[in-house]
């Protein structure tokens, strides 16, 4: 091989090596910021019911579902809240310490981001309340109501029974 080809080959190899190292460092840095989205059923059973796709304990994930009515437990001495999330299958318990969004209530859809500390317990660092701003076709809404009513989840557009009871109690005391 002549010297000119050797120098070209070494330059190409050096560039390839540099790009490989840079890519590896970027992927390593992003690894801690990538949060995979799961539903409660996928956390318990794995995606597509494959157990090897379950998130591992200690993994950062985002989980979205409906807050199960009657499961919200607030610590009176701190901002710690514990509640269950589910979709159409098993529930996952979420533990969160902080101020919850104004739209958070039982029967409401939320997304929680945090670390899985047990197979069905998420220690959340952030809780986002989902709200309905889009049109839902009547047939889809009817189908959702069929699924959510048997699970004890209230009407998605109206206030929950607990909210109504609290409102009646406040009105009765005035």
Curated annotation (Swiss-Prot):
GO-annotated cellular components: plasma membrane
Chain ranges on the Cytoplasmic side, renumbered to this chain: 1-8
Top-level division of the source organism's lineage: Bacteria
GO BP, sorted A to Z: cytochrome complex assembly
Coarse class of the protein's main subcellular location: membrane
UniProt: heme binding residues: 131, 135
Function of the molecule: Heme chaperone required for the biogenesis of c-type cytochromes. Transiently binds heme delivered by CcmC and transfers the heme to apo-cytochromes in a process facilitated by CcmF and CcmH.
Family label: Belongs to the CcmE/CycJ family.
Region (Disordered) location: 149-174
Protein name: Cytochrome c-type biogenesis protein CcmE
Membrane topology according to the record: Single-pass type II membrane protein
Periplasmic-side segments: 30-174
Keywords, sorted A to Z: Cell inner membrane, Cell membrane, Cytochrome c-type biogenesis, Heme, Iron, Membrane, Metal-binding, Signal-anchor, Transmembrane, Transmembrane helix
Pfam hit, one: CcmE
Family annotation (InterPro entries): CcmE, CcmE-like_sf, NA-bd_OB-fold
Biased composition (Basic and acidic residues): 156-174
Subcellular locations according to the entry: Cell inner membrane
Transmembrane segments: 9-29
GO MF, one example: metal ion binding
């Amino acid at each position: 091989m002549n010297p000119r080809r050797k120098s070209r080959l070494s330059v190409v190899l050096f560039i390839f090596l540099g790009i490989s190292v840079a890519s590896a460092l970027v992927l390593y840095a992003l690894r801690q910021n990538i949060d995979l989205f799961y539903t409660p059923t996928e956390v318990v059973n794995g995606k597509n019911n494959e157990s090897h796709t379950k998130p591992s304990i200690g993994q950062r994930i985002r989980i979205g579902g409906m807050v199960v009515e009657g499961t919200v437990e607030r610590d009176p001495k701190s901002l710690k809240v514990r509640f269950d999330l589910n979709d159409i299958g098993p529930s996952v318990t979420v533990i969160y310490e902080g101020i919850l969004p104004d739209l958070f209530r039982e029967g409401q859809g939320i997304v929680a981001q945090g670390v899985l500390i047990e197979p069905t317990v998420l220690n959340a660092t952030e809780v986002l309340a989902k709200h309905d701003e889009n049109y839902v076709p009547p047939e889809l809404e009817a189908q959702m109501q069929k699924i959510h009513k048997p699970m004890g989840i209230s009407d998605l557009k109206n206030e929950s029974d607990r909210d109504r009871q609290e409102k009646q109690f406040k009105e009765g005391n005035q």
